[in-house]
Amino acid sequence: MSYSGEMIREVAANAEPEPAAQPEDLGRYFLERANAGDVEGLVALYEPGAVLAFPPGRLAAGHEEIRKVYAELLADKPSFGSAGQRLAIRNGDLALTSTRLPGGGATVEVARRQPDGSWRWVIDQPAVLPCGDQGNGSRSGSPHPRRAGPAARVDDR
């Protein structure tokens, strides 16, 4: 039996996204899926009750709200990059993940090991800027028209 290219693409489009075997996989999968415009693949990186602090100053809670945020964000087909991912800090079934952004700043996330051994984010703060930075942080390191609003800041204590 032979399959047409259209059938193969349809099966691939409906395939479940690969789960993160390690917490560090989440950042890599984010970049791959965001740059591919894969909203559902991005949503799969989060637990059903996860919280995403994006755009800055707003919270999206749960898959439905996170899906809306990423559908709007990816509508303009932005390009996402990273200046390097830090090793996750683990404590049992929790992990703190972080990625440095090309334009400065960083992302900070809390991931949790799932019953099947995979990892998903439960809290995502993708726009933490260095003190004194007045821009709107993002994973791409550059402002985006839909990313207006107060930027999250690292508290200097």
Give residue ranges: language-model regions.
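Residue-level recognition of short loop/turn positions
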Residues: 49, 56, 115-118
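Short beta-strand edge/turn micro-motifs at domain boundaries
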Residues: 2-8, 106-137
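Generic structural signal for secondary-structure transition and capping sites
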Residues: 39, 75-79, 116
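Short, low-complexity N-terminal intrinsically disordered segments enriched in polar/charged residues
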Residues: 1-48, 131-157
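Structural motif
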Residues: 46, 90-91, 114-115
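Surface-exposed, charged secondary-structure patches
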Residues: 22, 51, 56-58, 64-108, ...
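Short beta-strand segments enriched in hydrophobic/aromatic residues
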Residues: 46-47, 101, 125
